[in-house]
């Protein structure tokens, strides 16, 4: 197992840095094309229908065809928009999505034409904070798109998105605090190295669950896709966008999904380390093999995105905000105190801290699941209150019949 040497960063030749940057870009673009196609295929199977199956063998070129179609369509700019901001908003959304992936470790040390280098573009002492900061910039593009469109629905979608990111990024940052505490670093390569023996998903299960929930809300995906709710806001912040500008918003969304999935892999699933029992093979974590394990873990999270979209209905806005502020943030704060206590026992030489942390995390997770289930069941089982006199309205008398009062129920029966 060869972990990257921190001194390697910043000493690669220029052509190798350029090659790694192009490699990261190609990896993200290919992942987006594959994710769109697989999402449509999987959703088709979930809904008992065929997915795209016309362009290319078994529809494999459908995503490429859609991208070319959007690029060649006429770009329509509606009247009344703030044109400079309207055109700049998609760019502001898509650039931070790519920049955030620069510090994600995709593997250990490899040899490229005789040069030893890490499968990571660069690393920082505060790499995770860099990712949080850069991904937060992307929401400015959404807000500006809603404001510059000069329409009510896009503006509401932009405001929803800003509130959503602020709410769920707090919970996401709190879920990272426990990882920093145990890894002793905010460097992404250092966090991966700290998980050589045990992945943090087992030690820090509540943090992992909080992060997974937050990352779905952060990327505006179902069931948290409130900024672009079709039934309420038509298309949300990108209602007035078409052609390549619309494609840039879609590209930013799927790149963000890939980035937060890669971050979850790095923080909780051991990064590029091979899973058990593959890790028993001596060469599993050397050479180019770690890139395969890393990609497989990222695709597990991307499938979770697809699964959630195909199975869960969209939440109401008040329910969504209540989950963030009333559940995720308080649970994260309580869990940080528990983890800090266990970490203190660890540093002072007391045994049993790992077992205690596992038990505490399991109990907390189970308790939250029970509370959430009981809450949802109580809401579903509530009886509808009896209608008051205000709900009953008179109707004109029918010739030959006495005047009656008609209720909404009787109207539905009559109309049927």
Curated annotation (Swiss-Prot):
InterPro entries in the cross-refs: NADH_UbQ_OxRdtase_su1/FPO, NADH_UbQ_OxRdtase_su1_CS
Keyword Nucleotide-binding found: no
Main location: membrane
Pfam families attached to this UniProt entry: NADHdh
EC number: 7.1.1.-
Membrane-spanning segments: 16-36, 84-104, 124-144, 165-185, 197-217, 260-280, 288-308, 320-340, 353-373
Keywords, sorted A to Z: Cell membrane, Membrane, NAD, Quinone, Translocase, Transmembrane, Transmembrane helix
GO cellular component, one term: plasma membrane
GO biological process, one term: aerobic respiration
A single MF term (Gene Ontology): NADH dehydrogenase activity
Reaction catalysed by this enzyme: a quinone + NADH + 5 H(+)(in) = a quinol + NAD(+) + 4 H(+)(out)
Membrane topology: Multi-pass membrane protein
Signal sequence, start to end: none
Family: Belongs to the complex I subunit 1 family.
Cited function: NDH-1 shuttles electrons from NADH, via FMN and iron-sulfur (Fe-S) centers, to quinones in the respiratory chain. The immediate electron acceptor for the enzyme in this species is believed to be menaquinone. Couples the redox reaction to proton translocation (for every two electrons transferred, four hydrogen ions are translocated across the cytoplasmic membrane), and thus conserves the redox energy in a proton gradient. This subunit may bind ubiquinone.
Subunit structure, as described in the record: NDH-1 is composed of 14 different subunits. Subunits NuoA, H, J, K, L, M, N constitute the membrane sector of the complex.
Protein name: NADH-quinone oxidoreductase subunit H
Organism of derivation: Mycobacterium sp. (strain KMS)
Gene that produces this protein: nuoH
């Amino acid at each position: 197992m060869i972990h990257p040497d921190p001194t390697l960063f910043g000493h690669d030749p220029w052509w190798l840095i350029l090659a790694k940057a192009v490699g990261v870009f190609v990896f993200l673009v290919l992942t987006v094309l594959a994710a769109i196609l697989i999402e449509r295929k999987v959703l088709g199977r979930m809904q008992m229908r065929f997915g795209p199956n016309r362009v290319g063998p078994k529809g494999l070129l459908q995503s490429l065809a859609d991208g070319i179609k959007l690029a060649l369509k006429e770009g329509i700019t509606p009247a009344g928009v703030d044109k400079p901001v309207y055109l700049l908003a998609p760019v502001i959304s898509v650039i931070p999505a790519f920049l955030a992936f620069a510090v994600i470790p995709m593997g250990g040390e490899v040899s490229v034409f005789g040069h030893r280098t890490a499968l990571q573009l660069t690393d920082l002492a505060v790499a995770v904070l860099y990712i949080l900061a850069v991904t937060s910039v992307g929401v400015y593009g959404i807000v500006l798109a809603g404001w510059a469109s000069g329409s009510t629905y896009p503006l509401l979608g932009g405001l929803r998105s800003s509130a959503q990111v602020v709410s769920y990024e707090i919970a996401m940052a709190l879920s990272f605090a426990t990882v920093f505490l145990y890894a002793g670093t905010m460097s992404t390569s250092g966090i991966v190295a700290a998980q050589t023996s045990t992945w943090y998903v087992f030690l820090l299960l509540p943090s992992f669950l909080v992060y997974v929930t937050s990352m779905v809300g952060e990327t505006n995906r179902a069931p948290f896709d409130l900024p672009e709710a079709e039934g309420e806001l038509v298309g949300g912040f990108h209602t007035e966008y078409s052609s390549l500008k619309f494609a840039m918003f879609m590209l930013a969304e799927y790149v963000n999904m890939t980035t937060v999935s890669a971050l979850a892999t790095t923080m909780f699933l051991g990064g590029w380390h091979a899973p058990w029992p593959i890790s028993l093979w001596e060469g599993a974590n050397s050479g180019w093999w770690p890139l395969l394990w890393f990609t497989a873990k990222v695709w597990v999270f991307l499938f979770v995105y697809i699964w959630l979209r195909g199975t869960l209905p969209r939440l109401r806005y008040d329910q969504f905000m209540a989950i963030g502020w009333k559940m995720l943030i308080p649970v994260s704060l309580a869990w940080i105190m528990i983890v800090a206590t266990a970490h203190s026992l660890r540093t002072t030489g007391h045994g049993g801290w790992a077992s205690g942390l596992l038990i505490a995390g399991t109990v907390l997770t189970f308790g939250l699941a029970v509370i959430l289930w009981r809450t949802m069941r109580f809401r579903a089982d509530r009886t509808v209150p009896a209608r008051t006199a205000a709900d009953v309205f008179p109707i004109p008398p029918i010739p030959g019949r006495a005047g009656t009062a008609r209720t909404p129920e009787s109207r539905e029966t009559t109309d049927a």
